[in-house]
Regions:
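Non-catalytic interaction-recognition regions
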Residues: 1, 5-160
Length: 160
């Protein structure tokens, strides 16, 4: 329901804004800043995830679980490289009891995904290998975003 979705998004704003900040520094909570759809906010990372889920569900391509490496562009490679850093950020956050590392990482992934998404009309591309690459990256982004959100105590949404 809409009420439930609003509650989840409100929780996202509060939780993410609290966890994005290093505990060793002071910060002032600013509702307007932390509820903005752009920037390091919970709404921004939720929006990136919803965008990815929507794209993935609209696709009619039968996804092959392999990359066509000659068809990866710079934005694809940046996101793939960042996705491969998951264990580093997770261990750093866990070992130091500093959840802001995971929150920062979630923002980094969301930002890179949005950059890839905006650079190419993925579903309109006539090259099925490029489309497959981008959808495969999208599927990994979705999986990692959900895992990161749940690790931070944030419930992912399907629609906004």
């Amino acid at each position: 329901s809409d009420v439930y979705k609003r509650q989840i998004l409100a929780n996202t704003i509060l939780t993410y804004s609290d966890l994005i900040t290093n505990r060793k520094t002071d910060y002032k909570f600013d509702l307007e800043k932390f509820s903005n759809i752009s920037g390091k906010t919970g709404i921004y990372v939720q929006y990136a995830l919803v965008r990815a889920k929507t794209l993935f569900h609209k696709s009619e391509l039968k996804l092959k679980k392999e990359f066509y490496t000659t068809k990866l562009d710079e934005k694809d490679l940046s996101l793939i490289h960042s996705l491969m850093k998951f264990e580093i950020y997770f261990e750093q956050s866990l070992n130091n009891s500093e959840p802001h590392h995971l929150a920062d990482y979630l923002y980094e992934l969301s930002n890179l995904y949005n950059s890839m998404y905006q650079s190419d009309n993925i579903l309109e591309n006539n090259d099925k290998e490029i489309t497959n690459n981008k959808l495969l990256i999208t599927s990994y982004f979705i999986d990692y975003s959900i895992l990161l959100m749940e690790s931070l105590g944030i419930s992912p949404v399907d629609k906004m």
